[in-house]
């Protein structure tokens, strides 16, 4: 929005030329989102407490979690508000990639909101019925996938980039739609599964978003994309501002979500952030790098799949409890130790993911 205003005022005030620079808008984006989150945090927490919107804790969960019962939840609303306002302020709103991310972010946020509302306000522990949750997730993902396919059909925007191989970029055709669907829905639910400890999901989300900011910048730059042997996608550069908005809003939320948490993001936050990360990965054609950088999310999801599969097939559990962060809690690890070690793993994986751009 402001970039349009800057274009109008440039002939009269040269200062507004600064807003043409992607790096300048990226810095303003992270600072704006961070400031909004820090400002909204106390207001949101107080409001949630007044409305008695508190976390529901399963009786079969770790005993250490019983103290979390009643902690304000649905704090993801302030994350989405901070990201959305920042995007509307600092991005080029004529860019279709920006609207693709916003559609998934707010659409999945709405699904998560209904789920949280039913759990916390209506006191329905099951929340939104699973089949309806997946229906709305699938509908949003397919709409975005079809739109992106129609927009970039048979171009670099629908190629599959394989890490470590510079000349392996097959054209996906209609398989692009299927891949996009699974990446968006899968990442959304993976982040949701990871959101089980204070700050556990938000920091890896921030790190992955920061990694994708670097990738989006390289993908949207003709010289660097050619140098790194990745597709040149001119619209991708604007995703740098989107990614930095996620980083800023996430860090602001972490201020209140760090152990011991004053607020939880709820499904309204985790489903939306995961969906946004998946969409960004698709747009910059780095779905496979997402598997590396988002390895913590993958690990959490696989632990649930393996646990359920093993119990149904063999009648035995592999882990003491799934997702895997609960396994380590039940082994006696203090919650902060689990959280920080998962953060460290995430940081290393993001660096490895970025290294794949050069190691080809």
UniProtKB/Swiss-Prot annotation:
Its cofactor is Mg(2+). Pathway: Cell wall biogenesis; peptidoglycan biosynthesis. The chain crosses the membrane at residues 26-46, 70-90, 94-114, 132-152, 168-188, 199-219, 236-256, 263-283, 288-308, 338-358. It catalyses: UDP-N-acetyl-alpha-D-muramoyl-L-alanyl-gamma-D-glutamyl-meso-2,6-diaminopimeloyl-D-alanyl-D-alanine + di-trans,octa-cis-undecaprenyl phosphate = di-trans,octa-cis-undecaprenyl diphospho-N-acetyl-alpha-D-muramoyl-L-alanyl-D-glutamyl-meso-2,6-diaminopimeloyl-D-alanyl-D-alanine + UMP. It is an enzyme of class 2 (transferase). It is a multi-pass membrane protein. One of its GO terms (cellular component) is plasma membrane. It is found in: Cell inner membrane. It holds the Pfam family Glycos_transf_4. Keywords: Cell cycle, Cell division, Cell inner membrane, Cell membrane, Cell shape, Cell wall biogenesis/degradation, Magnesium, Membrane, Metal-binding, Peptidoglycan synthesis, Transferase, Transmembrane, Transmembrane helix. GO terms for biological process: cell division; cell wall organization; peptidoglycan biosynthetic process; regulation of cell shape. Its EC number is 2.7.8.13. GO terms for molecular function: metal ion binding; phospho-N-acetylmuramoyl-pentapeptide-transferase activity; UDP-N-acetylmuramoyl-L-alanyl-D-glutamyl-meso-2,6-diaminopimelyl-D-alanyl-D-alanine:undecaprenyl-phosphate transferase activity. Catalyzes the initial step of the lipid cycle reactions in the biosynthesis of the cell wall peptidoglycan: transfers peptidoglycan precursor phospho-MurNAc-pentapeptide from UDP-MurNAc-pentapeptide onto the lipid carrier undecaprenyl phosphate, yielding undecaprenyl-pyrophosphoryl-MurNAc-pentapeptide, known as lipid I. NCBIfam families: mraY (TIGR00445). Belongs to the glycosyltransferase 4 family. MraY subfamily. This is Phospho-N-acetylmuramoyl-pentapeptide-transferase. It comes from Vibrio parahaemolyticus serotype O3:K6 (strain RIMD 2210633).
């Amino acid at each position: 929005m402001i970039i349009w205003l800057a274009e109008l005022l440039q002939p009269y005030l040269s200062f507004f030329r600064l807003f043409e620079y992607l790096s300048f808008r990226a810095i303003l984006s992270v600072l704006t989102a961070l400031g909004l989150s820090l400002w909204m945090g106390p207001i949101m927490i107080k409001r949630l407490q007044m409305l008695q919107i508190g976390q529901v804790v399963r009786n079969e969960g770790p005993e250490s979690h019983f103290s979390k019962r009643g902690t304000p939840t649905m704090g993801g609303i302030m994350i989405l508000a901070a990201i959305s306002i920042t995007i509307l302020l600092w991005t080029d709103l004529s860019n279709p990639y920006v609207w693709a991310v916003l559609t998934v972010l707010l659409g999945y946020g709405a699904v998560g909101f209904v789920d949280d509302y039913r759990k916390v306000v209506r006191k329905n522990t099951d929340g939104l019925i699973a089949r309806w949750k997946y229906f709305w997730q699938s509908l949003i993902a397919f709409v975005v996938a079809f739109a992106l396919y129609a927009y970039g059909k048979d171009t670099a925007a629908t190629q599959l980039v394989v890490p470590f191989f510079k000349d392996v970029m097959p054209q996906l055709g209609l398989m692009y739609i299927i891949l996009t669907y699974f990446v968006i829905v899968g990442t959304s639910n993976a982040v949701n599964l990871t959101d089980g400890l204070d700050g556990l999901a938000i920091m890896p989300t921030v790190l992955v978003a920061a990694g994708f900011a670097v990738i989006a910048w390289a993908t949207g730059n003709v010289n660097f994309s050619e140098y790194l042997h990745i597709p040149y996608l001119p619209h991708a550069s604007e995703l740098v501002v989107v990614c930095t908005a996620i980083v800023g809003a996430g860090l602001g939320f972490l201020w209140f979500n760090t152990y011991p948490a004053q607020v939880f993001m709820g499904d309204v936050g985790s489903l939306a952030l995961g969906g946004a990360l998946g969409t960004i990965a698709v747009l910059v054609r780095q779905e496979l790098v997402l598997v590396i950088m988002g390895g913590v999310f993958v690990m959490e999801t696989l632990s649930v799949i393996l646990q359920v599969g093993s119990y149904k097939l063999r009648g035995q559990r592999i882990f003491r409890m799934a997702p895997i962060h609960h396994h380590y809690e039940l082994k006696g690890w203090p919650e902060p130790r689990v959280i920080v070690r998962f953060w460290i793993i995430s940081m290393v994986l993001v660096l490895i993911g970025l290294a794949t751009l050069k190691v080809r």
